[in-house]
Design a protein with these regions (language model features):
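RNA-contacting regions in translation and RNA-metabolism proteins
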Residues: 1-205
Length: 205
């Protein structure tokens, strides 16, 4: 929810232009995820040149976003390029978006590494890939609330970013088979149960 002043200059994403009887109608958005990609293109020469590629964006506009980036050139640090010296580049984008928090993580072809990175700033102990595009992510007990995030935001954005259904657990809540203790197996498939105590774990898809 933003408030605009007359004469205020804003960067927006053009969704589409339609011809109407009264003339062209331009549909604009400040919440569209691709707006962040375009803002970084303006701020980061490595992005505009293609040396750094934005692989995925997950956004809850006005609150927080996660961006996965990768380098196409040896020796180019994708995260460092996005952040800029003393954080100048990412700060410029944050200011344009009214203070929206932005997490920049490194994309990885290996799903286990990518999933671990996506839950930053939490530290991940282990990622266990499960059937049907699900992943069980194990984090230390003291990192559990950080991995899940306030109202589940961190794990929710990580799921959107990666396209995986993520179940976050502490080591104490994972059995030797790598299954969350709030789950059960029926007919060879894992059926999730809603955890009664959010502090024990959290999932998002």
């Amino acid at each position: 929810n933003e408030f605009y002043r007359p004469g205020q200059r804003l960067k927006v994403f053009v969704l589409k232009v339609e011809d109407t009887p009264k003339g062209p109608a331009v549909f604009l958005s400040r919440a569209y995820p691709k707006l962040i990609s375009k803002l970084f293109e303006l701020e980061v020469p490595e992005v505009s040149s293609g040396a750094v590629v934005i692989k995925s964006v997950a956004r809850e506009a006005g609150s927080r976003s996660k961006i996965a980036v990768a380098s196409t050139v040896d020796g180019v640090d994708p995260i460092g390029s996005m952040v800029g010296q003393r954080g100048t580049r990412v700060t410029a984008v944050i200011n344009e978006l009214g203070g929206e928090k932005i997490d920049i993580i490194e994309w990885a072809e290996d799903p286990e590494k990518y999933l671990a990175n996506s839950l930053s700033p939490a530290k991940v102990v282990e990622v266990r890939i499960q059937p049907r595009n699900k992943a069980l992510v194990v984090v230390p007990e003291d990192q559990l609330s950080l991995a899940i995030g306030k109202n589940g935001q961190n794990v929710r954005l990580a799921a959107k970013l990666t396209g995986w259904k993520i179940d976050v657990r502490s080591p104490e809540n994972v059995d030797e088979k790598g299954i969350g203790k709030s789950e059960k197996e029926e007919g060879g498939e894992v059926e999730k149960k809603e955890a009664k105590k959010p502090a024990q774990g959290g999932s998002a898809s």
